[in-house]
Amino acid sequence: MVSTATQIGHFSFDNCLMNAAGVYCMTKEELMEVEKSQAASFVTKTGTLEVRPGNPEPRYADTRLGSINSMGLPNNGFRYYLDFVSDLAKTGQHKPHFLSVVGLSPTETETILKVIMASDYEGLVELNLSCPNVPGKPQIAYDFETTDQLLENIFTYYTKPLGIKLPPYFDIVHFDQAAAIFNKYPLSFVNCVNSIGNGLVIEDEQVLIKPKNGFGGIGGDYIKPTALANVHAFYKRLKPSIHIIGTGGIKTGRDAFEHILCGASMVQIGTALHQEGPAIFERVTKELKTIMVEKGYQSLDDFRGNLRYKD
């Protein structure tokens, strides 16, 4: 029997597919739609210390090859999502979940994580170090010194399962430098990647979205090669205890297969989920299992990370 079951840290999942933070996760109702689908789990909208309305609309647009967005982290505040995942865990349901959070300063991040630490939530936390769409706020994980200092401080008080969502890196030296930092800490996972920041899509003679004069994060088909490269680069560099979640350009079973082949333990779907809805998880799961049957693979472990190079 072909299985797409997987594991992140000590958490087991009956499938390897889930939503990406930002899509189908703003409200409890949206999260429950993902919960009731064939997704293995869900990740919440990235929650900040206070409620945020986000950037002015229009701030999202579908394109021929994916999407562009400058949402600006709209969310209901991290406590809204923390309360929801905590309450859901008490119902006895079997799915572990991911709580996505970030502070707009190191102090805010510490405040958020200390509240989670003191709560009864025992699930996974995804710390978003890579949002490219908050005006005046750089992507934290591009500053290696700041990232190192932030993680060093976090792990002086935070002992629950924690992973980080990363921006895409483009230089081999940066893969080496980032991995050296991440390997110092007891991270449960890294998520590769968030959208490619500050792209520009034009229709006729006008930009598609309003914030930042049309500049926004690029998702979908555009970013799959970059996402695959980041997944594989970190798979080869990180210690085995740090699992990898692959995000970027997944809309078919073949796309998911390639992410896992590059080393991903789990796969998140963003743009295609926004376009197709939660039914996408059933379709992509079937397509992935069909590929596995054709290739004689019974489990993800049979091919994870086994990307072949040319001689």
Swiss-Prot record:
Keywords: Cytoplasm, Flavoprotein, FMN, Oxidoreductase, Pyrimidine biosynthesis. The active site is at 131 (nucleophile). GO terms for molecular function: dihydroorotate dehydrogenase (fumarate) activity. Disulfide bonds: none annotated. Pathway: Pyrimidine metabolism; UMP biosynthesis via de novo pathway. It holds the Pfam family DHO_dh. FMN binds at residues 45-46, 128, 165, 193, 220, 248-249, 270-271. Catalyzes the conversion of dihydroorotate to orotate with fumarate as the electron acceptor. This is Putative dihydroorotate dehydrogenase A (fumarate). It comes from Streptococcus pyogenes serotype M3 (strain ATCC BAA-595 / MGAS315). The gene is pyrD.
